[in-house]
Structure formats: structure tokens, C-alpha cells
């Protein structure tokens, strides 16, 4: 048995300004999703569509009113409304107590911080809301009408009590967040309904909708060689999530609040360190395109190897989170720290890739300390696994071999989860064999 991927549709996801905030263009996203589903129906010809399942980034959400209508469309975590959080609500709860409750890294982008900001500045929207749904949940809801979230999203939101496994209603009340808006949590991947949407492609009518693969990083972990405990995995896309499987929750051993304990499908847990990822180079490319300089990520990766610049930036510095011009911020950082200033795109690429690799070296040390595991390899998945230069630098800075692939880890993990739910795959052992039979893994980057 093996999996064959065929891309039906691909589109850009961009941030727009709405009411003075950085928001996702939800109407555009919906339009493109349904276009993609229609194309998939056409591409499969007479073959039956067995199921549909959605994965997305975590944290961001929309609000439904009591009539079930989306009245508050998703705002991006890159909006400045959570600036200073969670430290600014320390009078309500300290960061130490917060971590003890949910085991999530202290970060301003979490759903909790966004909702706290709304409670302070937009309370009317929260009182009007009937249910909160995360991005992939909204897609599922639009397809089948079921307002349900899944375990992977809930544990990432900073609102699940890690000891009880339920929504932390006491915490929500402290923050001024109405607990009535928190949806039912689906802890086991399963069919939650069938597609029943006006105007949908006829082939999709009554097709099962599967929930359980919400958080993209969590579902990407299904593509990792999890039969080998001494392999760490790095999901490297816009964000970078470096993690490993964790057999039990033990908050007492974690003294670093940049570590998160996140739920994975089928009740598993993972220890994760998060970092900015390819966002830095993505924003540089966007700025170059605006200025008429056209390049590709593959070309930048190749040319970075020929650049002689050795400057290093602190990739998680706040200045790089949502700048107007990423290239200017990198130049200014190098000036301020007395380093060589990048000039050509290849120089910027080398600075970014080297700096990311150095950061991952720091994070792997943290992960080894907390997990008690000395990792023998790192498996890099998602888009960054295609970047040979970056993967070689990761191996160099981390000091252990790097395995790369699959590049489309989230899509593949999503398909694997559906296949398990629909009884196409029996268990984890069969899943592992199918992954190994289906995809090429490069084990060529050694420190």
C-alpha cells in the first residue's frame, strides 16, 4: 500500500486591513477552498470521494452568533492587539500559574491572549457570540454544520486545563471570556457530519467530514518515524516547531516557559519549542517582488551557499514579527550589532538561513534537557525540508544528522488521519509502513 498525492489547487493566503486590524481575507479563503474542492472532484473523475478533512494554523478564530452565523471574521495573530501580553495581565494571573494550568509557552499570539484583548477592548463581540471556532473548524462547520473543535486546537489555545483535559472555565472567567462560547472538544479523530452545503459540487453531497487534524503541526507529526524515540522532528514552514513525542505530562520538570506541551491526534502528547521559520525570507521575497526583483526560494537556497556573509540575527526579536519592510529591519539589526550588512538577495538568504539554523541548535539543547533524550537525528518536514542549504546548516549547528521529508507533511498527515478514521489503514504500524513505501526520505545531511 502507498499514498499518491495529486495537487488540485494552491493559492496565496494574505493579510488584509479591516477596521484598523490585520485580518485574514476570509471571503477569499472560502472562495478558494470551494474552488479547490470542485477541482478535486473533477480531477478524480468517476472515483468516489471518501471523506474531507481540514487542517490549518492554530490560535486564530472566528465567532458565530446564536443563529450560527459568522459575524466576527478571523483576525490575524500578527495584529498588534495583543502587544505586551501575557505579561500585562499578571495582576489577573502570573505567567508561572498560567503555565502550570495549561503547559503552553508564554506567547502573545495565543487564543487566550487574543480573547483577553477582546474582553478588554471589544467585549460586545464576546457577549454577542454563541460559539468560537478555529480556522479549520470554521471550514468543517461550513461544510456540515457541526460547531466542534478538536483536541489539537484546544490544547494549543492556552485554554485547556492540562490536568483535567477540559476547558479551563475558571481561567476564562478570570479573563472576562464567556465560557459559553467554547465549543465541544472532539478528543478522538472521527466523522462529525456529512457535507450539506448549498451550491457544493454534487459529488461532495453527503461525503463524511472528519475532525481531528485541525492543528497543522500536530497532524504533520503523523509523518514522522515515531517508532524511533531518539528522532526529534522539525516542522519548518512560516513557523518552525521543533518537537518530540512525550509519554507523560510532567510539568515539574519544565522550568522553561518557551516550551509547550501540545496535544497530538489520538491523545498523544508532544513537547515543542516554537520559533519563527521561513516567515523571514517570505517577507523579504514579498518586498523584493514589490520592487520588481523576482526570485524563487530554490534559487535563493542555491545562491546562499555562495555568499560569504557571516552575519547572524536574533530571529525571534520582536522587530521581525510584523515589520513593514523585513529587509530594512535585517539591515538595521546588522548595523546596530556591528555586523556586515547584507546587500544582494543571496546575502539576506544566507543571514536568515544561518540564523535559523543557529536558533534550532539552541532549541534542540532545550528539548534534550526537558525530555531527557539525547537525539540521534532530526527529521525536517514541511516546506523547509526542500531547502538543502538550510538543512545542511541545521545539521552543522545542531551537530547531528538531518533526515528530510516529506515536504507536504500536513497534507499527508491529514490524509493518513482520514484513512485511519475511515478504516482504510488499521493502526500505527500499518501507517508507518505506508509512509515509508510512499515517500522519499533524504538522509544525507551530516554535521
Explain the meaning of each model-derived region.
Residues 175-190, 415:
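A conserved helix-loop-beta module that forms one wall/lid of the active-site cleft
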Residues 55-58, 188-190, 236-239, 377-385:
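Glycine-rich beta-strand-to-loop/alpha-helix junction loops that act as flexible
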Residues 3, 47, 180, 229, ...:
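Structured loop/turn residues at beta-strand edges in well-structured enzyme cores
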Residues 46-56, 131, 184, 370-382:
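Short glycine-rich phosphate-binding loop at a beta-alpha junction
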Residues 18, 41-77, 105-109, 136, ...:
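Short beta-strand-loop/turn "lid" adjacent to the catalytic site in phosphate-handling enzymes
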Residues 75-94:
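Short alpha-helix plus adjacent loop in nuclease-associated cores
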Residues 1-72, 100, 128, 200-210, ...:
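N-terminal glycine/serine-rich phosphate-binding loop of ATP-dependent small-molecule kinases
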Residues 90-102, 113-146, 159-161, 165-166, ...:
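Active-site core segments that coordinate phosphate-bearing ligands/cofactors
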Amino acid at each position: 500500500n502507498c499514498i499518491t498525492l495529486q495537487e488540485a489547487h494552491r493559492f496565496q493566503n494574505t493579510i488584509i486591513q479591516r477596521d484598523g486590524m490585520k485580518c485574514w481575507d476570509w471571503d477569499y479563503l472560502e472562495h478558494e477552498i470551494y474552488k479547490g474542492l470542485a477541482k478535486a472532484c473533477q480531477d478524480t473523475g468517476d472515483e468516489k470521494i471518501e471523506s474531507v478533512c481540514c487542517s490549518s494554523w492554530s490560535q486564530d478564530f472566528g465567532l458565530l452568533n446564536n443563529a450560527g452565523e459568522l459575524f466576527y471574521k478571523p483576525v490575524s495573530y500578527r495584529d498588534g492587539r495583543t502587544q505586551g501580553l501575557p505579561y500585562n495581565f499578571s495582576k489577573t494571573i502570573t505567567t508561572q500559574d498560567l503555565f502550570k494550568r495549561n503547559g503552553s509557552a508564554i506567547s502573545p499570539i495565543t487564543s487566550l491572549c487574543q480573547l483577553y484583548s477582546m474582553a478588554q477592548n471589544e467585549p460586545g463581540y464576546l457577549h454577542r457570540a454563541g460559539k468560537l471556532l478555529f480556522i479549520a473548524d470554521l471550514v468543517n462547520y461550513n461544510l456540515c454544520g457541526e460547531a466542534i473543535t478538536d483536541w489539537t486546537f484546544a490544547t494549543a489555545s492556552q485554554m485547556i486545563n492540562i490536568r483535567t483535559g477540559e476547558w479551563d472555565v475558571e481561567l476564562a472567567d478570570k479573563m472576562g471570556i464567556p465560557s459559553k462560547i467554547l465549543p465541544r472538544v472532539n478528543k478522538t479523530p472521527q466523522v462529525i457530519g456529512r457535507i450539506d452545503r448549498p451550491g457544493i459540487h454534487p459529488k461532495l453531497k453527503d461525503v463524511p467530514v472528519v475532525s481531528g487534524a485541525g492543528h497543522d503541526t500536530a497532524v504533520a507529526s503523523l509523518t514522522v518515524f515515531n517508532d524511533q524515540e531518539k528522532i526529534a522532528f522539525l516542522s519548518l514552514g512560516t513557523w518552525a516547531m521543533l518537537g518530540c513525542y512525550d509519554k507523560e505530562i510532567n510539568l515539574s520538570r519544565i522550568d522553561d516557559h518557551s516550551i509547550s506541551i501540545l496535544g497530538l491526534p489520538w491523545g498523544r502528547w508532544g513537547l515543542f519549542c516554537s520559533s519563527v521559520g521561513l516567515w523571514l525570507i517570505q517577507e523579504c521575497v514579498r518586498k523584493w517582488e514589490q520592487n520588481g526583483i523576482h526570485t524563487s526560494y530554490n534559487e535563493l537556497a542555491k545562491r546562499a551557499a555562495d555568499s560569504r556573509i557571516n552575519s547572524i540575527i536574533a530571529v525571534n526579536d520582536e522587530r521581525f514579527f510584523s515589520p513593514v519592510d523585513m529587509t530594512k529591519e535585517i539591515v538595521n539589526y546588522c548595523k546596530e550589532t556591528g555586523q556586515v550588512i547584507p546587500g544582494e538577495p543571496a546575502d539576506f538568504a544566507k543571514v536568515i538561513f544561518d540564523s535559523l539554523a543557529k536558533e534550532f541548535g539552541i532549541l534542540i539543547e532545550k528539548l534534550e534537557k526537558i525530555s531527557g533524550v539525547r537525539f540521534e537525528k532530526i527529521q525536517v518536514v514541511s516546506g523547509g525540508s526542500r531547502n538543502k542549504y538550510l538543512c545542511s546548516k541545521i545539521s552543522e549547528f545542531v551537530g547531528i544528522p538531518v533526515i528530510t521529508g516529506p515536504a507536504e507533511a500536513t497534507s499527508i498527515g491529514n490524509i493518513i488521519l482520514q484513512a485511519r478514521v475511515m478504516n482504510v489503514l488499521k493502526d500505527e504500524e500499518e501507517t508507518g509502513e505506508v509512509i515509508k513505501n510512499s515517500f522519499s526520505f533524504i538522509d544525507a545531511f551530516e554535521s
